[in-house]
């Protein structure tokens, strides 16, 4: 891998991780096209580069993680974040670990995952239509009132996204929007989960490839991915904070559909 390819991989990772398009799939495509890598190695490289997203999230949402730590000593808001992270992580681990090994062995599931992303995207667009007709955006849920059931659903959505072609942020943001949460709450609650899921993915990729993915060029791609990720997070959260709830749903839905189509075509 030369420095140019490393830079491209970093930019792709930094943008695609936070959009409803699978960063793993985009990294796989770039790696196969530009590096002539095997699908198995390209898949592991995509998971390894999620470390860039992990570090970017830790930097951007450091205040949230500090609150979660204070939840251990009785801070009410911190406890809500702590419970959310623990519940979703537990569910993700239970459901996601078996799926990872299945996905790595049978990468043909990518096309099926692409169809699933299209279905999810259509569901979010349909949700936007309902929002527009009902005009109940003021009654959307806030994170403070999230139930254990909703947390578990988010964990399942995150676990399923280990399959090639499925976007982690796309799956979790979609789940939260369909559960009725405000767009800004959905984006933030989804992005906050990146470190836990990403660390697990990076560790699995490193171990399964015997450390072969941790090259100097891959580390450069990771560094570039961190910078691009922070810029992308800020832009998306600002967009989600806008009052155009219906527009946010439509855009997310259309991006999910586009991501699914890309996976099916390529």
From Swiss-Prot:
Catalytic activity reads: di-trans,octa-cis-undecaprenyl diphosphate + H2O = di-trans,octa-cis-undecaprenyl phosphate + phosphate + H(+)
User: What is the superkingdom listed in this entry's lineage?
Assistant: Archaea
Q: What are its GO cellular component terms?
A: plasma membrane
Q: Topology versus the membrane, per the UniProt entry?
A: Multi-pass membrane protein
GO MF terms held by the record: undecaprenyl-diphosphatase activity
The GO annotation for biological process reads: peptidoglycan metabolic process
Its annotated compartments are:
Cell membrane
**Residue stretches spanning the membrane:** 41-61, 82-102, 106-126, 159-179, 191-211, 213-233, 246-266
**Carries keyword Transcription?**
no
EC annotation from Swiss-Prot or TrEMBL: 3.6.1.27
Q: What class of enzyme is it?
A: hydrolase
Q: Which UniProt keywords apply?
A: Cell membrane, Hydrolase, Membrane, Transmembrane, Transmembrane helix
- Note whether Protein biosynthesis occurs among the keywords: no
The SS bond pairs are none
Primary localization: membrane
UniProt function note: Catalyzes the dephosphorylation of undecaprenyl diphosphate (UPP).
Family in the record: Belongs to the UppP family.
**What's the protein name?**
Undecaprenyl-diphosphatase
What is the organism of origin for this protein? Pyrobaculum aerophilum (strain ATCC 51768 / DSM 7523 / JCM 9630 / CIP 104966 / NBRC 100827 / IM2)
Q: Per UniProt, what is the name of the gene that codes for the protein in this document?
A: uppP
């Amino acid at each position: 891998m030369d420095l140019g390819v490393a830079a491209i991989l970093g930019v792709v990772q930094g943008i695609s991780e936070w959009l409803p398009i699978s960063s793993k799939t985009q990294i796989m495509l770039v790696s196969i096209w530009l590096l002539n890598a095997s699908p198995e190695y390209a898949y592991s490289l995509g998971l390894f580069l999620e470390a860039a997203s992990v570090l970017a999230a830790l930097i951007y949402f450091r205040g949230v993680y500090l609150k979660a730590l204070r939840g251990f000593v009785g801070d009410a808001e911190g406890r809500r974040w702590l419970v959310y992270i623990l519940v979703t992580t537990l569910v993700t681990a239970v459901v996601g670990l078996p799926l990872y090994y299945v996905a790595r062995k049978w990468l043909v599931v990518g096309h099926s995952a692409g169809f699933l992303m299209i279905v999810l995207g259509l569901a979010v667009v349909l949700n936007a239509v309902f929002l527009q007709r009902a005009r109940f955006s003021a009654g959307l849920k806030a994170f403070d009132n999230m139930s254990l059931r909703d947390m578990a659903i988010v964990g399942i959505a995150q676990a399923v996204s280990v399959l090639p072609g499925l976007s982690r942020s796309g799956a979790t943001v979609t789940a939260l929007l369909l559960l009725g949460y405000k767009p800004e709450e959905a984006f933030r609650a989804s992005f906050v989960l990146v470190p836990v899921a990403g660390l697990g993915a990076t560790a699995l990729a490193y171990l399964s490839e015997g450390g072969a993915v941790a090259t100097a060029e891959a580390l450069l791609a990771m560094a570039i991915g961190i910078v691009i990720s922070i810029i992308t997070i800020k832009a998306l959260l600002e967009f989600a904070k806008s009052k155009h709830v219906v527009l946010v749903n439509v855009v997310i839905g259309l991006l999910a559909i586009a991501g699914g189509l890309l996976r099916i075509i390529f």
